[in-house]
């Protein structure tokens, strides 16, 4: 395969999205639309990738650089919206001195497969001409440019409005994806004339110009694969296709999805074999789940790591958490950023953690908040325990040693330490460090008044009779 550069058109406003946000920044499975064609170009080994920006140029550039910080990006600006040919021409300066193949992609076409683009580049090499293109066959080609052939050879693209009745019967359409020789591309773009009253320049003219200089290569792709996004209905439709692809890939790799139609799994998620994922689970980008895990119904994992053999019970939420092997989490647990759990940890219903490191075999099974905490191994934290970590200005650390037992309804007022093997009685407010092997109790002594209820009722009856 020849040396490759790529131009990705990201300048459009996307008026039909009815949004203040640039169209290519609208998310599809957790990533902006434009991330998908950009990723494809990089997968193919493009040595220069030129996103052409226009509408909200700074926002688009910032987003793309954030997604691909180490990529060979060279941004180009289309100052006015004057058609696709003008947009590509905006990239000429960014590719000055380059003489290889230029792959032209659209920032709002997220479903193109790598294999299709590899076939396009191979078709370009095989044809030996100036240009190769992707075509697609549509049941209803109304509105699309038709691929006109002569003896099987591509000769030009005719827009629907300009087609003769015979040409309108053609169902092979232009998908708008091209591989073009750079030297030909820049010269041909300079020759293209505006096609309408708005002074717009269209790339489709390139095909006829290339056909006059040699054979035009072509490869056919499924219509779903080449479909763009113009409004939010189409955005949702493309997302469904992409989600199905992702879910099927996981299942073929040994992952069980109880209800593939409701499992929301973004790109950039890794799941090990023999893991079972329940209905309506969300696995966001950056999440890694080991083998033999169970992710229960309605659970949400954002950029979290779950080691082998762990069970996440239904409706638990993990955000940038690190979970060790054989943990049992939930139901209804929330692990916030900075949570790190060792092996065999149990966190039960309505337990919330934040910046908490919890050692091997420790348990907090009910109604507990553990924030800014370091908890040793083999600890038991009773129901209703709270680390009081915030004084109104600063956060403070709570430390529990190994083998600590914390009774129910305990408040640990940070900064505070409870030493190895210590016990804290139920209902205690711990404000001072507890030495190893100690018992800390701060409850008010119980007072029992026998016969008090009868005395109270008699007094109330007398008052009513008054």
Swiss-Prot record:
One of its GO terms (cellular component) is cytoplasm. The keyword Cell wall biogenesis/degradation applies. It is found in: Cytoplasm. GO terms for biological process: cell morphogenesis; cell wall organization; lipid A biosynthetic process; peptidoglycan biosynthetic process; regulation of cell shape; UDP-N-acetylglucosamine biosynthetic process. Acetyl-CoA binds at residues 383, 389-390, 408, 426, 443. Residues 254-466 are annotated as: N-acetyltransferase. The keyword Cell wall biogenesis/degradation applies. Its EC number is 2.7.7.23, 2.3.1.157. Residues 233-253 are annotated as: Linker. Its main location: cytoplasm. It holds the Pfam family NTP_transferase. Binds 1 Mg(2+) ion per subunit. Pathway: Nucleotide-sugar biosynthesis; UDP-N-acetyl-alpha-D-glucosamine biosynthesis; N-acetyl-alpha-D-glucosamine 1-phosphate from alpha-D-glucosamine 6-phosphate (route II): step 2/2; Nucleotide-sugar biosynthesis; UDP-N-acetyl-alpha-D-glucosamine biosynthesis; UDP-N-acetyl-alpha-D-glucosamine from N-acetyl-alpha-D-glucosamine 1-phosphate: step 1/1; Bacterial outer membrane biogenesis; LPS lipid A biosynthesis. The active site is at 366 (proton acceptor). It catalyses: alpha-D-glucosamine 1-phosphate + acetyl-CoA = N-acetyl-alpha-D-glucosamine 1-phosphate + CoA + H(+); N-acetyl-alpha-D-glucosamine 1-phosphate + UTP + H(+) = UDP-N-acetyl-alpha-D-glucosamine + diphosphate. Homotrimer. Catalyzes the last two sequential reactions in the de novo biosynthetic pathway for UDP-N-acetylglucosamine (UDP-GlcNAc). The C-terminal domain catalyzes the transfer of acetyl group from acetyl coenzyme A to glucosamine-1-phosphate (GlcN-1-P) to produce N-acetylglucosamine-1-phosphate (GlcNAc-1-P), which is converted into UDP-GlcNAc by the transfer of uridine 5-monophosphate (from uridine 5-triphosphate), a reaction catalyzed by the N-terminal domain. In the N-terminal section; belongs to the N-acetylglucosamine-1-phosphate uridyltransferase family. In the C-terminal section; belongs to the transferase hexapeptide repeat family. This is Bifunctional protein GlmU. The gene is glmU.
